């Protein structure tokens, strides 16, 4: 098997190792399923992620889509709580880092995303934390959002 293939088992091991006991096992499974769905999706919509998950697991598409929808509407799963595990995981072996803070406008939907990236030696950037905000709420608040990230 190609070592770069992201399987349910491999993603589950990674996510479980990252969040440890801070997230219920069923939530770890839901996050794992969503990650595998995203990696195998053609776009990032609930339907496409569910279809990607169904393709990998053999589930019926409607059931996989429902799983993704339930995860995203579950208020007990906090993105910021997951970031608290993601960032130390990515930075664990690093003694010194260079980061970039970037705003990206999405004119079509009236949103902006601010992201903090780890700049790597090979010229790419790994996203550490990000947040999307409505452009209409940016005025005089850009620095506040940057501080939050």
Each model region followed by its residue ranges:
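Conserved, well-structured functional cores that handle cations and Mg-NTP chemistry
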Residues: 1-149
């Amino acid at each position: 098997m190609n070592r770069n293939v992201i399987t349910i088992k491999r993603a589950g091991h990674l996510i479980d190792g990252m969040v440890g006991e801070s997230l219920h096992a069923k939530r770890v499974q839901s996050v794992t399923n969503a990650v595998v769905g995203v990696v195998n999706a053609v776009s990032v919509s609930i339907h496409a992620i569910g279809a990607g998950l169904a393709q990998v697991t053999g589930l019926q598409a409607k059931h996989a889509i429902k799983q993704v929808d339930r995860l995203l509407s579950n208020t007990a799963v906090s993105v910021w709580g997951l970031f608290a595990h993601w960032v130390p995981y990515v930075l664990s072996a690093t003694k010194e880092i260079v980061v970039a803070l970037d705003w990206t406008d999405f004119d079509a939907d009236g949103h902006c995303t601010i992201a903090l990236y780890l700049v790597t030696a090979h010229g790419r950037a790994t996203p550490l934390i990000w947040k999307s905000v409505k452009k209409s709420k940016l005025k005089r608040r850009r620095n506040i959002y940057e501080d939050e990230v």
